Amino acid sequence: MRMRTGFLLLLVLLAFPLAILGQDATPEATPEAAPIELPAVDPLAVTGDIVTAGSSTVFPLSEAVAQLFIDEGFSGAVTIDSVGTGGGFERFCGKGETDVANASRPVKDSEVEACAALSPARTPIAFRVGTDALAVVVSSANDFAEALTCQQLAAAFSGQAATWADLDPSWPAEAIRLFSPGSDSGTFDYFVEAVLEAEDCGNLGDEAEAAILGAANIQFSEDDHVLVQGVEGSPYALGYFGFAYYSEEADRLKALAIDGGSGPVAPSFDTVEAGEYLLARPLYIYSDATVMQDKPQVADFINFYLSNVDSVIGDVGYFPASTEALNEARQAWLDAMGQ
């Protein structure tokens, strides 16, 4: 019996340091996926024109990539119309008159159906190109508001709060002058969904869009520069638009921190990258495999876009997509081209 007890004790003593070693061992970090490399594109060798239209948010990013494409030798024309995401899909799917649609939201089922009804039919392919943070802004002359809860933001844009004092009794009893992108804008769609419809925010459900469209003292525009100027013009104005437009006028505007339930968080590279800022959203360009195969210049432009977007996106004022998201976009390009 003593020998058996001693044997068991020996096993315990031997196992103890192994357990300690196992606890101290540091698990290996999962390596980040290597970027997929697309075939090299020489802009000097690309001929033909490219027509794009859509999101005003994606517009400055596409403009920067197109300028780089031209700077490196492309001699054709790149048309980029800022008509809102909905307007872009109308021209791409409803009329079939553009090669690329710029979008600040995913394509809707109704838009996919419109693409399928074209002759020849189109199938929209999404290419993720970056991330935008929606900036909720006031004039730099506003000296009382630094942050809003998601519920306060929803109350303002749904018309439930008419004055700043309705949001916070310590703020002025002055009417809130609202500025919003129009209903054709993907930015508008995203705001309605993320702020007004969301259960933990506005909780307006199917009534959300009607609420903002019926709000008093609100100005809508598909031109973000009009919204910027409107907010700049009054200390009692409140607006929202893509972070790049805020960045251009940061000396005259103030971006408010947004509290989604874990404390106020201001938009920045770090907070967007960490997933801490509530109002961050993906940016896309869309095309179709047949369009890309029939128009090599379109395929080459999208290839160039996906290969070079990270070199310009920071200067524009947006945030890079993850390697994984860009790899999915690059793989979608390869699949569309049968490679």
Model-identified regions with their sequence ranges:
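Extracellular/periplasmic juxtamembrane helices and adjacent flexible linkers that interface
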Residues: 2, 42-47, 275-276, 284-339
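Ser/Thr-rich, Proline-interspersed low-complexity disordered segments
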Residues: 9-44
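N-terminal segment of the mature folded domain
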Residues: 31-159
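Short beta-strand->loop
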Residues: 51-55, 138-139, 164-184, 287-288
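Ligand-binding pocket segment of bilobal, Venus flytrap-like solute-binding proteins
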Residues: 89, 180-265
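Ligand-binding "clamshell"
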Residues: 111-126, 247-273
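Small-molecule pocket liners
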Residues: 125, 131-136, 175-177, 253-254, ...
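Short helix-loop capping/hinge motifs at secondary-structure junctions, enriched
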Residues: 141-147, 184-187, 201, 291-295
